[in-house]
Amino acid sequence: MKEILTEWRKFVMSEKLMLKPGPNGWDKYCELVAEAYARAPKFDESAVSSFEAMKPFVDKMFKRIEGVVDVQFVEEHPYENAQELRQDVKNNGVLKISTLDAEHDIFDPETNAKFRAIHDYMSHIQRNTEFDAKGEIASYNAHLQTMPPK
């Protein structure tokens, strides 16, 4: 399983989001990803050490982001779309992060919320990605390049 994930990571990092819209492009890709996600085990013991290795990275990156914007954890979904998120940061210097639907098998709630802040800042603000499949895949690719190698 670890070798499969390593090879997948190499592929995804080199993937340039060149799929075309339509039933044999993005739609099919999203369908395949959703099917793979649905078939995957909810918990994989072999992933625990990788998530544990990410915790110092999460703390470090979160501190950097806090130095740039006021991160506020909220018990709601504060933004309808990525444009609203970017406008809030631009106009108010505030990045609201939802703590709803945030259960994680390995990260504690605080670490998971910090990781969400990193995701939103690095992806939706710095890379200008949307809250759609293409934007989230681009976000995932960006995250992979910054994660610790373990």
Identify the meaning behind each predicted range.
Residues V12, C30, A38, D120-M122, ...:
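Compositionally biased, intrinsically disordered low-complexity regions enriched in proline and serine
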Residues V71-K150:
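Core of folded catalytic or high-affinity ligand/protein-binding domains
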Residues S14-F107:
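Glycine-rich short-loop/terminal segments
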Residues M1-L17:
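Short acidic, low-complexity intrinsically disordered linear motifs used
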